[in-house]
Design a protein with these regions (language model features):
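Active-site-adjacent beta->alpha loops and helix N-cap segments on the catalytic face
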Residues: 2-27, 43-46, 69-88, 101-108, ...
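Structural beta-sheet core signal
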Residues: 30-32, 66, 94, 154
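Catalytic cores of alpha/beta
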Residues: 37-58, 92, 99-116, 137-154, ...
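Beta-hairpin (beta-strand-turn-beta-strand) motif
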Residues: 33-35, 69, 97
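Short, structured loop/turn "capping" segments at alpha-beta junctions
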Residues: 90-94, 120-122
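Glycine-rich nucleotide/cofactor/substrate-binding loop typically near the N-terminus or early
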Residues: 27-41
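Glycine-rich phosphate-binding active-site loops on the catalytic face of alpha/beta enzymes
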Residues: 1-6, 55-72, 116-132, 158, ...
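A general structural motif
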Residues: 23-27, 61, 89, 149, ...
Length: 181
């Protein structure tokens, strides 16, 4: 459900997407998010996420996309650690929830995500719904700080017409967008 920033797709959607993408030798990253709204989850929602992770792995997802924050918009280390056993060592991507983390704490968050085993962070570079070009300097700062320890994937306003310029200006390794293809 893109209207709320993405939620966990149905069993059937994951199954069909995996079949289709794997035929084309493209990897599948499955969003694990039980609802729209904020990224603060209670115990019941964490159990739902554990089950969804197990189903996504069973259906041959190649990556899992998660975004868990505390009430004060910091990485929910405890919640992530609860989910880790169910991930079965699949590569983990931190959702654009990263943009809700205060700018002053984002470098610490990168370190925490590296320590938790995440391989990629999806970010717009700002919690504001602004033009991504306004965030180029901050995105470059994040890419430089990550220094290859974790991939910074830029998103939110990336198109087929601008992704190459954004990659060049930020140094990001990858871009994400519904308007790239």
């Amino acid at each position: 459900n893109l209207a709320v920033g993405g939620t966990t797709p149905s069993y059937g959607v994951i199954k069909e997407a995996a079949r289709y993408l794997h035929e084309k030798e493209i990897s599948l990253a499955t969003m694990i998010r039980p609802r729209g709204g904020n990224f603060v989850y209670n115990d019941s929602e964490l159990r739902i996420m554990e089950d969804d992770i197990l189903r996504a792995a069973e259906l041959e997802s190649d990556n899992l996309v998660l975004g868990l924050l505390t009430e004060d918009n910091h990485i929910d280390i405890e919640g992530i650690e609860q989910l880790l056993p169910s991930t079965q060592d699949l590569p983990l991507v931190f959702h654009m929830a990263f943009d809700q983390i205060p700018l002053a704490n984002q470098k610490e968050a990168i370190d925490q995500l590296v320590d938790l085993g995440f391989v990629r962070i999806l970010t717009h570079g700002s919690s504001e719904n602004n033009d991504i070009f306004e965030n180029v300097d901050h995105l470059k700062e994040l890419v430089d700080y990550a220094n290859g320890r974790i991939e910074i994937m830029i998103g939110g306003g990336v198109t087929a017409d601008n992704y190459q310029e954004l990659i060049e200006k930020t140094g990001a390794q990858a871009a994400h967008g519904t308007k790239i293809c």
